[in-house]
């Protein structure tokens, strides 16, 4: 018959056997690998996207401390005096974007407005394309097409305009044999961008409202 101490040992033995063995410092589980930061992946994806028009304006605004005087020429080639618009002409600019763009004075005022929004390159590109389409000499066409590409299409240019990938691919193919219409699709896209994005703000701008008031005052004085 077991003595009381032996009986106590027999009762406690099974309970100790059911308990899991303790881990020593050598048997400790390896630390969990660090979690990847999901923001890194998102950041990479964002960087692969092209800047939209708002980001371009903000980027240029942060790098330009002041505006330089606007040259009197339209494409900075041959200086010409800026025409003075009539009151009727100024009012017609609000009727349609086409009327604004077909007016030399309208283009000049609108270009000045685009400069304040840091998107003047859109107008410069459109004007350069208009000059290219009027050129008949193939050697001149080749040179002008190259300059337009370097100034407004190349991703290395500070004056790069916002074009989608389809239009860019088309330009790259056409640049193998440039013609006067190499940039037609791109010109239409930039024209549409100015029409939808910048034109409504121009009509509400202080500059255009001042021209309207000036024209109204002029009409009243003549009456």
UniProtKB/Swiss-Prot annotation:
This is Regulator of G-protein signaling 19. Residues 213-223 are annotated as: Interaction with GIPC. Residues 1-30 are annotated as: Disordered. Residues 96-212 form the RGS domain. It is a lipid-anchor. The gene is RGS19. Its main location: membrane. One of its GO terms (cellular component) is membrane. It comes from Bos taurus (Bovine). Inhibits signal transduction by increasing the GTPase activity of G protein alpha subunits thereby driving them into their inactive GDP-bound form. Binds to G-alpha subfamily 1 members, with the order G(i)a3 > G(i)a1 > G(o)a >> G(z)a/G(i)a2. Activity on G(z)-alpha is inhibited by phosphorylation and palmitoylation of the G-protein. Interacts with GIPC PDZ domain. Interacts with GNAO1. Keywords: Autophagy, Lipoprotein, Membrane, Palmitate, Phosphoprotein, Signal transduction inhibitor. The modification Phosphoserine is found at residues 24, 103, 157. PROSITE patterns: RGS.
């Amino acid at each position: 018959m077991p003595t009381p101490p032996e009986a106590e040992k027999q009762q406690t033995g099974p309970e100790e056997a059911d308990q899991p063995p303790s881990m020593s410092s050598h048997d400790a589980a390896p630390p969990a690998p660090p979690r990847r930061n999901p923001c890194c992946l998102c950041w990479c994806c964002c960087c692969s996207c092209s800047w939209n028009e708002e980001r371009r304006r903000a980027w240029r605004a942060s790098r330009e401390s002041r505006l330089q005087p606007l040259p009197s020429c339209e494409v900075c080639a041959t200086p010409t005096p800026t025409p003075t618009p009539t009151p009727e002409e100024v009012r017609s600019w609000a009727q349609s974007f086409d009327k604004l763009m077909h007016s030399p004075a309208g283009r000049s005022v609108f270009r000045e407005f685009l400069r304040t929004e840091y998107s003047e390159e859109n107008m410069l590109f459109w004007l350069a394309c208009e000059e290219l389409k009027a050129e008949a000499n193939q050697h001149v066409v080749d040179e002008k097409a190259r300059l337009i590409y370097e100034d407004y299409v190349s991703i290395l240019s500070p004056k790069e305009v916002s074009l989608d990938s389809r239009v860019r691919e088309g330009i790259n193919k056409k640049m193998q044999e440039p013609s006067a219409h190499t940039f037609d699709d791109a010109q239409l896209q930039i024209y549409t961008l100015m029409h939808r994005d910048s034109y409504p703000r121009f009509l509400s701008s202080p500059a255009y409202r001042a021209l309207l008031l000036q024209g109204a005052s002029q009409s009243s004085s003549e009456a």
